[in-house]
């Protein structure tokens, strides 16, 4: 039986000129409390091993102690930059176990998709802005944080919180949209469109940015599939795989949008530039989705006095005995929840999470050998990991 001890570099077998150094767990470029153990020969990375666990908060154990609806605040705290998306996936999974998925009102579903796509743009803005900081571009970070603040205010207006929302419940929503929200959101989208075009021009098409990211950290498609990579990282390697299309959950089948993929336009398919390009392109697609949701929420599924966002929320949650897996497309990739239920309680026997950041980080060692230390920072930043989700 193989040892469960973590991988460590062997100090006793160092060759001449090789040094083992630590990056983190307090280093700003590691995007959280992640420690990278790096074997270097001068400025060249010969090997790298990520060490995690510094932010472990026992999410899965908490989920075994609390009723299903009371777990949602803990779901928020995994990928805290995309809490709406995480809530959507979790609530959808419990609804499918209960067999009430088709009973959810259309207005509720469109609101869920609307706030999830706003949160997707917000998450991608953090990824793009902090990535600029990683490779020496400070000003774009200020730009995306300025525009992300508008999204934070919209979501705060909806839920009362700026980041950890507890808004999407099993069977419905905490509240309906505030009066005037749809119009204010339309104004924001009108403001955002030229800002996204500016972001594309100033960052993605920037010559210095291209020199810093093109042909760096190339992730071949076969390697991405073998490691189970999902989300923008997989699509940047050239595969059109998006669970919003593949699984067609919620009202996404009724919405028209495209799946951006990496093409190696300025370098090699699957490099750091492609990963950032895909995230910016996905912001444009999220804008299209939001516009279509607003059209439905102001038209066919407009607000009525009789509408109750909690009408389908079950008073007691008693799923049958089953093993059940649900997945959804988070900004980082495939977020999955595996439930094992016993049938006589409103608390799951087991709730296992498939965290996309955790899986995506696993490929770092494979694509970072024989690169410069400065390029290792660029590679890690292009992964867009969140340590709250990795450590859970």
Swiss-Prot record:
Keyword NAD on entry: yes
Broad class of where this protein is predominantly found: membrane
Transmembrane keyword on record: no
GO cellular component terms given for this protein: plasma membrane
Top-level EC class as recorded in UniProt: translocase
Quaternary structure annotation from Swiss-Prot or TrEMBL: NDH-1 is composed of 14 different subunits. Subunits NuoB, C, D, E, F, and G constitute the peripheral sector of the complex.
Designated name of the protein: NADH-quinone oxidoreductase subunit D 1
Organism: Cytophaga hutchinsonii (strain ATCC 33406 / DSM 1761 / CIP 103989 / NBRC 15051 / NCIMB 9469 / D465)
Encoding gene per record: nuoD1
